[in-house]
């Protein structure tokens, strides 16, 4: 009996696609978006090279039928698309928890040990005596949008604690409004707000406002956060007899824009201590407006503003302005390791001379200090040095105190010289782990139906532009629309097909893509085994692609001239065990790089004077002409 006319073709298709994912050894269903892309790759890059597992793992998991139906019905079918296509979409609200809390609100219903991704109104309001405890609110979630309104308002002699709010989240939008407002007596603590978050957008409004006789401690706000913005408005405003401590705000953070407004404003008989703001931050943009303004008979202490930070832009406006009978002390402002632009406006100003204020140290470069009371203010030290002098002084201080490597500075091994890429060399390996939330590519048929504009993405994915995710979308689009640097050719790829097209356009169709095989060895010492230069170690051109934060995978790809690419076996530092296979790229022309680039901080030298090498991190990739 003769075979149906299309059967041989179908069998051939099955054989081709099942062998197509050669890099990971997995068989691919031919009726999937993944298989469709592999067929596309084979047409565009017909060199029969294996498809690397790291790239195949990023492909859409959608079935072909799903890909077709979703492409025709966005945004109506968004929820099932998010689930089936492995996208980064806003987390669904915990409606069951929200309902149970609504029943138990208004002074009871606690303590609560866990709460995830819902809006909360009135916790412990009007409570008398006893204690409230809240252990964890939305920990370790992706694309969180939470609001918490009124905690312990109008309570009396109540002890309340809040242990953790939005810790370790990805793309977190957190809004906390009113904590212990108008409360009398009692005490409380807030231990951690948005700690270890990635791309946060956090707001805290009114902490102990109009409270009476309270003792309060806020331990940590946005500690070790990465790339985002935070605001805190109103701490102890109009309070009476408050003893308040704020321990850390934005310390050890990376590229964070933060604002703190009104600390202890118009307080009576308050004892306030703020221990550290923006310490060891990297490229911070900090604004602090109003500390102890209009206070009466208060004792205010501020210890440390942007100490040991790296560049950035900071301003502090108004300290103890218009205060009466205050004793205020400010210790250490602007003592940065690498100076940024720092301004301080208004210290102890006002018509009432009945105060005593001490300022122990104001240091750094590009600083300005404007407006302070002509009497009752004692300055211990004021330094306005050049950038070079300040950097030298801070470097010597760091060495003498044993701090060879500050948290903000480039991680050991993040940048290195080409001469270090030799077999047998022992060197530090940076943390190359992918910090982005997991996502997959959208099939091109779906991606091209979503205009690459913030408003369109917001509408399709239900992401308000004033949230952390919305701001990330806006930032990604803006970076993609930015004009390229001199010698750079760039493109933002919204699908896997787009990446292949750009690489072929730049390098031809006989190409390969590489990335470091795993994260083994990250953050420790390694030894290099066999080191091989790609294309014989010749100076070449590559296409490097870096992830951008978006609901689906979007890559910023750019063609980089004058590079050498290396592959290296990565061995355990103390044995002959191979633990990884690394890919490194050396940029030979750095003349257009910024003088403040972390590479020059780590290696010395200036733009154009030294080459800079780095590993290809997990999640990123580099394309070159095939050997």
Curated annotation (Swiss-Prot):
Q: Superkingdom, according to UniProt? A: Eukaryota
BURP domain location, by residue? 415-626
Q: Which residues cross the membrane?
A: none
Q: Provide this UniProt record's keywords sorted from A to Z.
A: Glycoprotein, Signal
Q: Which PANTHER family match?
A: POLYGALACTURONASE 1 BETA-LIKE PROTEIN 2 (PTHR31458:SF2)
- What does UniProt give as the signal peptide span? 1-25
Sugar attachment sites are 119, 175, 251, 366, 384, 530
Identification of the protein by name: BURP domain-containing protein 12
Tissue pattern of expression reads: Expressed in stems, leaves, shoot and panicles.
Recorded hits in Pfam families, A to Z, give: BURP
Q: Which residues form a coiled coil?
A: none
The record's annotation in InterPro entries points to:
BURP_dom (IPR004873), PG-associated_BURP (IPR051897)
